[in-house]
Amino acid sequence: MPVQSMSRIISYWAARQADRVAIDHEGRAITWGEFEERTNRLARAYSELGVQPDDFVTIALPNGIEFFEACFAVWKLGATPQPISAKLPKSERDQIIDLGKPSLVVGAETGAFEQIVSVPQGFVPGEHLSAEPLPELTAASLKAMTSGGSTGRPKLIVSAQPAAWDTDLPYLEIPQQGAMLVPGPLYHNGPFVWAMIALFRGCTVAITTRFDAEQTLTTLERLKINIVYMVPTMMRRIWALPEDVRTGYDLSSLQTLWHLAAPCPAWLKECFIEWLGAEVIWELYAGTEGQGTTMIRGDEWLTHKGSVGRPVEACEIKIVGEAGETLPSGEVG
Protein backbone atom coordinates (compact mmCIF):
# COMPACT_ATOMS: atom_id res chain seq x y z
CA MET A 1 0.00 0.00 0.00
CA PRO A 2 1.35 3.50 -0.78
CA VAL A 3 2.47 5.89 1.91
CA GLN A 4 -0.51 7.65 3.46
CA SER A 5 -0.82 11.14 4.81
CA MET A 6 -1.55 11.35 8.54
CA SER A 7 -4.73 13.14 7.52
CA ARG A 8 -5.94 9.88 5.95
CA ILE A 9 -4.67 7.15 8.29
CA ILE A 10 -7.60 7.15 10.73
CA SER A 11 -10.02 7.11 7.80
CA TYR A 12 -8.16 4.13 6.35
CA TRP A 13 -8.43 2.06 9.52
CA ALA A 14 -11.94 3.25 10.39
CA ALA A 15 -13.12 1.88 7.04
CA ARG A 16 -11.62 -1.51 7.90
CA GLN A 17 -12.29 -1.86 11.64
CA ALA A 18 -14.78 0.82 12.67
CA ASP A 19 -15.97 -1.03 15.78
CA ARG A 20 -12.55 -2.10 17.04
CA VAL A 21 -11.03 -0.15 19.93
CA ALA A 22 -8.45 2.39 18.77
CA ILE A 23 -7.41 3.76 22.18
CA ASP A 24 -7.97 2.45 25.70
CA HIS A 25 -7.26 4.76 28.64
CA GLU A 26 -7.60 2.73 31.83
CA GLY A 27 -10.84 1.14 30.63
CA ARG A 28 -12.31 4.16 28.86
CA ALA A 29 -12.20 3.36 25.15
CA ILE A 30 -12.86 4.90 21.76
CA THR A 31 -13.41 2.93 18.54
CA TRP A 32 -11.80 3.70 15.20
CA GLY A 33 -15.13 4.91 13.85
CA GLU A 34 -15.60 7.29 16.77
CA PHE A 35 -11.97 8.41 16.52
CA GLU A 36 -12.46 9.32 12.86
CA GLU A 37 -15.63 11.35 13.40
CA ARG A 38 -14.40 13.15 16.51
CA THR A 39 -11.07 14.17 14.97
CA ASN A 40 -12.82 15.44 11.82
CA ARG A 41 -15.04 17.73 13.89
CA LEU A 42 -12.14 18.79 16.09
CA ALA A 43 -9.98 19.59 13.06
CA ARG A 44 -12.72 21.86 11.72
CA ALA A 45 -12.90 23.60 15.10
CA TYR A 46 -9.13 24.16 15.08
CA SER A 47 -9.41 25.49 11.53
CA GLU A 48 -12.04 28.00 12.65
CA LEU A 49 -9.57 29.09 15.35
CA GLY A 50 -6.97 29.86 12.68
CA VAL A 51 -4.80 26.75 12.27
CA GLN A 52 -3.26 26.59 8.78
CA PRO A 53 -1.11 23.98 6.97
CA ASP A 54 2.42 23.70 8.40
CA ASP A 55 1.56 25.70 11.52
CA PHE A 56 2.77 24.40 14.86
CA VAL A 57 0.06 23.58 17.39
CA THR A 58 1.21 23.24 21.00
CA ILE A 59 -0.53 20.39 22.82
CA ALA A 60 -0.29 20.69 26.62
CA LEU A 61 -2.55 17.80 27.58
CA PRO A 62 -2.01 14.92 30.01
CA ASN A 63 -2.10 11.29 28.89
CA GLY A 64 -5.58 10.54 27.64
CA ILE A 65 -7.74 10.02 24.58
CA GLU A 66 -7.98 13.81 24.19
CA PHE A 67 -4.22 13.98 23.57
CA PHE A 68 -4.49 11.67 20.55
CA GLU A 69 -7.57 13.43 19.23
CA ALA A 70 -5.75 16.76 19.34
CA CYS A 71 -2.67 15.41 17.52
CA PHE A 72 -4.66 13.77 14.73
CA ALA A 73 -6.93 16.80 14.34
CA VAL A 74 -3.78 18.87 13.83
CA TRP A 75 -2.43 16.40 11.26
CA LYS A 76 -5.77 16.48 9.43
CA LEU A 77 -5.19 20.20 8.84
CA GLY A 78 -1.68 19.58 7.49
CA ALA A 79 -0.20 21.14 10.63
CA THR A 80 2.42 19.85 13.09
CA PRO A 81 1.73 18.83 16.72
CA GLN A 82 4.15 20.15 19.35
CA PRO A 83 3.52 18.20 22.58
CA ILE A 84 4.64 19.61 25.93
CA SER A 85 4.04 18.61 29.54
CA ALA A 86 0.69 19.75 30.89
CA LYS A 87 2.45 20.38 34.22
CA LEU A 88 5.09 22.83 33.00
CA PRO A 89 5.46 25.99 35.08
CA LYS A 90 4.06 28.99 33.26
CA SER A 91 7.51 30.52 32.76
CA GLU A 92 8.83 27.40 31.00
CA ARG A 93 5.66 26.96 28.98
CA ASP A 94 5.82 30.56 27.81
CA GLN A 95 9.45 30.14 26.69
CA ILE A 96 8.44 27.19 24.53
CA ILE A 97 5.43 29.06 23.14
CA ASP A 98 7.68 31.99 22.24
CA LEU A 99 10.13 29.61 20.57
CA GLY A 100 7.59 27.70 18.48
CA LYS A 101 5.15 30.53 17.78
CA PRO A 102 2.19 28.17 17.37
CA SER A 103 -1.11 29.26 15.88
CA LEU A 104 -2.99 27.46 18.69
CA VAL A 105 -2.27 26.15 22.19
CA VAL A 106 -4.42 23.22 23.30
CA GLY A 107 -4.58 22.72 27.06
CA ALA A 108 -4.19 26.32 28.25
CA GLU A 109 -6.89 28.52 29.67
CA THR A 110 -8.70 30.72 27.16
CA GLY A 111 -6.95 34.08 26.85
CA ALA A 112 -3.68 32.80 28.34
CA PHE A 113 -1.65 34.51 25.60
CA GLU A 114 -2.00 37.97 24.14
CA GLN A 115 -1.50 37.07 20.48
CA ILE A 116 -2.02 33.29 20.38
CA VAL A 117 -5.37 31.53 20.56
CA SER A 118 -5.72 28.88 23.27
CA VAL A 119 -8.36 26.35 24.29
CA PRO A 120 -8.52 24.51 27.63
CA GLN A 121 -8.40 20.80 28.36
CA GLY A 122 -11.85 19.37 27.68
CA PHE A 123 -12.51 21.67 24.71
CA VAL A 124 -15.49 20.38 22.70
CA PRO A 125 -16.08 21.39 19.06
CA GLY A 126 -19.43 22.91 18.16
CA GLU A 127 -22.28 20.62 17.13
CA HIS A 128 -22.60 22.52 13.84
CA LEU A 129 -19.27 21.14 12.62
CA SER A 130 -19.30 18.23 10.19
CA ALA A 131 -17.81 14.84 11.01
CA GLU A 132 -17.23 14.07 7.32
CA PRO A 133 -13.66 13.54 6.02
CA LEU A 134 -11.54 16.60 5.27
CA PRO A 135 -9.40 17.27 2.18
CA GLU A 136 -6.07 15.45 2.28
CA LEU A 137 -3.19 17.60 3.57
CA THR A 138 0.32 16.56 4.60
CA ALA A 139 2.40 18.61 7.03
CA ALA A 140 6.05 19.13 6.10
CA SER A 141 7.02 17.93 9.58
CA LEU A 142 5.61 14.97 11.49
CA LYS A 143 6.29 16.38 14.96
CA ALA A 144 8.07 19.11 16.91
CA MET A 145 9.33 17.91 20.27
CA THR A 146 10.89 20.01 23.02
CA SER A 147 13.99 19.43 25.10
CA GLY A 148 16.01 21.39 27.62
CA GLY A 149 19.19 19.76 26.38
CA SER A 150 22.50 20.53 28.04
CA THR A 151 21.87 24.28 28.03
CA GLY A 152 18.88 24.18 30.38
CA ARG A 153 16.92 26.36 27.96
CA PRO A 154 14.15 24.80 25.88
CA LYS A 155 14.84 23.91 22.29
CA LEU A 156 12.51 22.75 19.55
CA ILE A 157 13.44 19.57 17.69
CA VAL A 158 11.51 19.67 14.42
CA SER A 159 11.31 16.38 12.54
CA ALA A 160 12.52 16.42 8.94
CA GLN A 161 10.05 13.63 8.12
CA PRO A 162 6.77 14.66 6.50
CA ALA A 163 3.53 13.64 8.24
CA ALA A 164 2.99 10.49 6.20
CA TRP A 165 3.45 6.77 6.86
CA ASP A 166 3.27 3.41 5.09
CA THR A 167 0.77 1.46 7.18
CA ASP A 168 2.17 -1.83 5.84
CA LEU A 169 5.77 -0.99 6.81
CA PRO A 170 7.10 -3.38 9.49
CA TYR A 171 8.73 -1.19 12.13
CA LEU A 172 9.87 -1.60 15.73
CA GLU A 173 8.35 -5.10 15.84
CA ILE A 174 4.90 -3.46 16.05
CA PRO A 175 2.40 -5.94 14.60
CA GLN A 176 -0.20 -4.62 12.20
CA GLN A 177 -3.60 -4.48 13.96
CA GLY A 178 -2.03 -5.69 17.19
CA ALA A 179 -2.29 -4.26 20.70
CA MET A 180 0.28 -1.97 22.30
CA LEU A 181 0.70 -0.57 25.81
CA VAL A 182 2.51 2.74 26.35
CA PRO A 183 2.61 3.57 30.09
CA GLY A 184 4.91 6.60 29.70
CA PRO A 185 4.18 10.34 29.31
CA LEU A 186 3.12 11.04 25.73
CA TYR A 187 4.87 14.42 25.53
CA HIS A 188 8.18 12.52 25.66
CA ASN A 189 9.52 11.50 22.27
CA GLY A 190 9.74 7.74 22.93
CA PRO A 191 6.17 7.17 24.16
CA PHE A 192 4.86 9.56 21.50
CA VAL A 193 6.62 7.74 18.66
CA TRP A 194 5.74 4.22 19.82
CA ALA A 195 2.08 5.07 20.44
CA MET A 196 1.62 6.93 17.17
CA ILE A 197 3.32 4.31 15.00
CA ALA A 198 1.15 1.66 16.63
CA LEU A 199 -1.92 3.67 15.60
CA PHE A 200 -0.48 4.13 12.10
CA ARG A 201 -0.28 0.32 11.99
CA GLY A 202 -3.92 -0.07 13.01
CA CYS A 203 -3.21 -1.28 16.55
CA THR A 204 -5.27 -0.81 19.66
CA VAL A 205 -3.16 1.49 21.85
CA ALA A 206 -3.52 1.34 25.63
CA ILE A 207 -2.26 4.19 27.80
CA THR A 208 -2.25 5.01 31.51
CA THR A 209 -2.44 8.34 33.29
CA ARG A 210 0.85 7.56 35.03
CA PHE A 211 2.98 4.47 35.47
CA ASP A 212 1.94 1.92 38.06
CA ALA A 213 3.70 -1.44 38.14
CA GLU A 214 0.76 -3.72 38.88
CA GLN A 215 -1.63 -1.72 36.70
CA THR A 216 0.78 -2.34 33.83
CA LEU A 217 0.54 -6.10 34.35
CA THR A 218 -3.25 -5.87 34.68
CA THR A 219 -3.47 -4.01 31.36
CA LEU A 220 -1.15 -6.46 29.61
CA GLU A 221 -3.47 -9.29 30.61
CA ARG A 222 -6.80 -7.46 30.13
CA LEU A 223 -6.13 -6.32 26.57
CA LYS A 224 -3.89 -9.23 25.53
CA ILE A 225 -1.12 -6.77 24.70
CA ASN A 226 1.45 -7.87 22.08
CA ILE A 227 4.03 -5.12 22.56
CA VAL A 228 4.92 -2.76 25.39
CA TYR A 229 7.17 0.31 25.70
CA MET A 230 9.20 0.70 28.90
CA VAL A 231 12.18 2.43 30.45
CA PRO A 232 14.46 0.73 32.99
CA THR A 233 12.81 2.50 35.95
CA MET A 234 9.49 0.89 35.01
CA MET A 235 11.16 -2.51 34.73
CA ARG A 236 12.76 -2.09 38.14
CA ARG A 237 9.40 -1.23 39.75
CA ILE A 238 7.74 -4.25 38.18
CA TRP A 239 10.56 -6.49 39.40
CA ALA A 240 10.15 -5.06 42.93
CA LEU A 241 6.59 -6.40 43.14
CA PRO A 242 6.10 -9.53 45.25
CA GLU A 243 6.91 -12.53 43.06
CA ASP A 244 3.43 -14.02 43.42
CA VAL A 245 1.95 -10.73 42.17
CA ARG A 246 4.40 -10.36 39.28
CA THR A 247 3.93 -13.93 38.08
CA GLY A 248 0.18 -14.03 38.72
CA TYR A 249 -0.81 -12.43 35.41
CA ASP A 250 -1.22 -14.10 32.02
CA LEU A 251 1.34 -12.43 29.75
CA SER A 252 1.28 -15.11 27.06
CA SER A 253 0.17 -12.58 24.41
CA LEU A 254 3.29 -10.43 24.92
CA GLN A 255 5.68 -10.75 21.98
CA THR A 256 7.93 -7.71 22.42
CA LEU A 257 9.09 -5.53 25.33
CA TRP A 258 11.09 -2.48 24.27
CA HIS A 259 13.30 -0.67 26.76
CA LEU A 260 15.17 2.53 26.01
CA ALA A 261 15.78 6.12 27.18
CA ALA A 262 18.32 5.15 29.89
CA PRO A 263 20.94 2.46 30.58
CA CYS A 264 19.41 -0.77 31.87
CA PRO A 265 21.37 -2.55 34.63
CA ALA A 266 22.63 -5.90 33.37
CA TRP A 267 21.14 -7.78 36.34
CA LEU A 268 17.69 -6.32 35.64
CA LYS A 269 17.83 -7.16 31.96
CA GLU A 270 18.91 -10.71 32.79
CA CYS A 271 15.94 -11.06 35.16
CA PHE A 272 13.48 -9.96 32.47
CA ILE A 273 15.09 -12.26 29.90
CA GLU A 274 14.75 -15.20 32.27
CA TRP A 275 11.15 -14.24 33.07
CA LEU A 276 9.76 -13.38 29.61
CA GLY A 277 12.26 -14.93 27.20
CA ALA A 278 15.30 -13.52 25.42
CA GLU A 279 13.52 -13.00 22.10
CA VAL A 280 10.87 -10.83 23.76
CA ILE A 281 13.31 -8.25 25.16
CA TRP A 282 14.51 -5.55 22.76
CA GLU A 283 16.67 -2.48 23.44
CA LEU A 284 16.93 0.67 21.34
CA TYR A 285 19.49 3.47 21.55
CA ALA A 286 18.68 6.74 19.78
CA GLY A 287 17.90 10.41 20.34
CA THR A 288 14.99 12.73 19.67
CA GLU A 289 17.06 14.47 16.99
CA GLY A 290 17.07 11.23 14.99
CA GLN A 291 20.73 11.18 13.92
CA GLY A 292 20.90 7.41 14.22
CA THR A 293 19.53 4.30 15.90
CA THR A 294 20.85 0.99 17.19
CA MET A 295 18.84 -2.06 18.26
CA ILE A 296 19.57 -5.38 19.93
CA ARG A 297 17.41 -8.37 20.86
CA GLY A 298 17.81 -10.20 24.15
CA ASP A 299 19.39 -13.35 22.69
CA GLU A 300 21.99 -11.21 20.89
CA TRP A 301 22.63 -9.22 24.07
CA LEU A 302 23.37 -12.40 26.04
CA THR A 303 26.42 -12.96 23.84
CA HIS A 304 27.38 -9.24 23.83
CA LYS A 305 26.45 -8.01 27.30
CA GLY A 306 26.58 -4.24 27.60
CA SER A 307 25.98 -3.70 23.89
CA VAL A 308 23.17 -1.50 22.58
CA GLY A 309 23.23 -3.32 19.27
CA ARG A 310 24.00 -2.66 15.65
CA PRO A 311 23.07 0.45 13.65
CA VAL A 312 19.87 0.23 11.64
CA GLU A 313 18.54 2.01 8.57
CA ALA A 314 21.09 4.48 7.15
CA CYS A 315 22.97 4.91 10.43
CA GLU A 316 26.73 4.33 10.78
CA ILE A 317 28.57 4.19 14.10
CA LYS A 318 32.16 5.36 14.57
CA ILE A 319 34.07 5.37 17.87
CA VAL A 320 36.89 7.93 18.07
CA GLY A 321 39.75 8.63 20.44
CA GLU A 322 40.69 11.89 22.14
CA ALA A 323 42.39 13.17 18.98
CA GLY A 324 39.42 12.26 16.79
CA GLU A 325 41.03 9.16 15.31
CA THR A 326 38.83 6.17 14.47
CA LEU A 327 39.26 3.36 16.99
CA PRO A 328 39.06 -0.36 16.18
CA SER A 329 36.26 -2.59 17.44
CA GLY A 330 36.47 -3.29 21.16
CA GLU A 331 38.27 -0.07 22.09
CA VAL A 332 36.75 2.51 24.44
CA GLY A 333 36.45 6.00 22.99
Indicate where each model-derived feature is located.
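Conserved AMP-binding/adenylate-forming core of the ANL superfamily
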Residues: 2, 11, 19-64, 68, ...
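Structural core segment of the AMP-binding/adenylate-forming
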Residues: 44, 48-49, 69-72, 76-137
